[in-house]
C-alpha cells in the first residue's frame, strides 16, 4: 500500500493508475451493494436512492450538501449485534473517536453499550447527553491534569493508563478526591496487524502503551499496585484498525494473558483478585468496497472468546472478562455522504486515454481519509437512473490541494452532469470526526433518518460560525 501522508504540493502529480483498477460493467453502475451501503437503502422507480423511506434528493433539497445521512436503524442494529456477540453491552465500549455527538451518545446509552472517550471534549459531550459515567472509559496517551480531574469528578468507570507519569498523576488526583479509581494498563504487545502504517498501533516503535517485551508494562503494573488510590482491574491492548484477520488478535491475546500470568505469579491473590478484564481494543474491519469480506461479527467474537479462554486455560488462570472497543464497525456502514456534482473535466493522460475529474461540493475537509490513508470508497449516482456507459473518473473536492481526492480511479455513468447527486458509502467513521474548516468551508450537517422521518442532529456550520472565534 502506498503511503500518502499529506497529499502532494501544488502542481505535483497525484497518483493515478492509467486506467481504473476496479473494473465494473456499465449495468452495475447503479448497484448499491448490501455489504457496503446502509441496511435500509433502496432506489425508487425513477432511480432516486432512498434511505429508510427518505429520498436523498429531498434531503439534499432541505438540508443542503455536502450532507452526512445516518441510517439510525442500521447504527442501532450494529450496536445490538455486537453486544449480543460479546456477551452484553457492558463489554462493548463504543469508540467515540469514530463519531460522537450528543444524539449518538444517547443511542449508545439506549442500546446498553459502554463508551470509550479519548479527550475532555468527548467526555463533555457524553456527559451533556447524560451518558452514565460509570459506563465510560477514558483513554489517551497524553491526558492532561484537567482531563484526569474531570474524569475522576464525573465518576468514570475506568481510566486506561498509558504511561508511568500518568500513574503518579492519577494517584494524586484520586487521593485528593477521596476515591479509589479503577484502571487498566495499556500494553504494547508488538503485534502489527495487516493495516495501514498510520493506523497500526501495537508495534513497538509508537506512542501508545507500555511495552511487554521491554518490561515497561510489568514495571507499570508494579507501580500501580504500590499506589494507595488506584485499583488495577485489567489489561488493555489495541493492535490497529480495519483488521480482517483474527491472527493478530490471537497473538495479542497470547501476550496479554502471558503478562497476566506473570502478574499473578508475582503478587499475592489479594492484589490480583480484581484483575479480571482483558480489553482487546477495537479494529474490527468493515466493507468499503463490494469485494471486501470482513469476518461476520459473531464468528469474530467466538474466535476472540475462544482465544482468551484457551490462553487462560493454558496457564491455569480463570477466564477474564473480554471487552472490545468497536467504533468503525458500528458507525461506519450506516452513513453516506451526499454531494452535488459541479465542474467536470476530461484530462488527456495519454494519446489514447483520458481521465474525468468530477468535482463535488465537499472534499478533504469532510473526508480526509483518502489523502491520509489511501482509503477507497464506493461512489454512486443517487439522484436518478442512467443507462449510459461507464466512464473512468476520480471524484475530487473543491479545495486548493491537488491531493484533495475523495474517490480515486472509479467508474461513473458517462452522462453524469453538474447538478447530479452522488453518494459515497460507509463514511460514518473518521470522516466528520476528522473534518476541518480547510479553505473556510463549514462542516456539513448530519441528518438521522428512520422509518420515513428525518431529523437534523448536527447543523451545518455557517459563516457566522467561521467568524465566531475572531476577537475583533
From Swiss-Prot:
EC nos: 4.1.1.20
Keyword Lyase: yes
GO molecular function, one term: pyridoxal phosphate binding
One Gene Ontology biological process: lysine biosynthetic process via diaminopimelate
Keywords: Amino-acid biosynthesis, Decarboxylase, Lyase, Lysine biosynthesis, Pyridoxal phosphate
Catalysed conversion reaction: meso-2,6-diaminopimelate + H(+) = L-lysine + CO2
Keyword Amino-acid biosynthesis annotated: yes
Binding site for substrate: 328, 369, 373, 401, 430
Region annotation (Disordered) ranges: 1-23
Catalytic center residues: 400
Pathway listed: Amino-acid biosynthesis; L-lysine biosynthesis via DAP pathway; L-lysine from DL-2,6-diaminopimelate: step 1/1
Pfam assignment, any one: Orn_Arg_deC_N
Cofactor(s), names only, from the UniProt record: pyridoxal 5'-phosphate
UniProt-listed InterPro entries: Ala_racemase/Decarboxylase_C, DAP_deCOOHase_LysA, De-COase2_C, De-COase2_N, De-COase2_pyr-phos_BS, Orn/DAP/Arg_de-COase, PLP-binding_barrel
N6-(pyridoxal phosphate)lysine PTM positions: 97
Family classification: Belongs to the Orn/Lys/Arg decarboxylase class-II family. LysA subfamily.
PANTHER family hit by this protein: DIAMINOPIMELATE DECARBOXYLASE (PTHR43727), GROUP IV DECARBOXYLASE (PTHR43727:SF2)
Name of the protein this chain belongs to: Diaminopimelate decarboxylase
Organism of provenance: Mycobacterium leprae (strain TN)
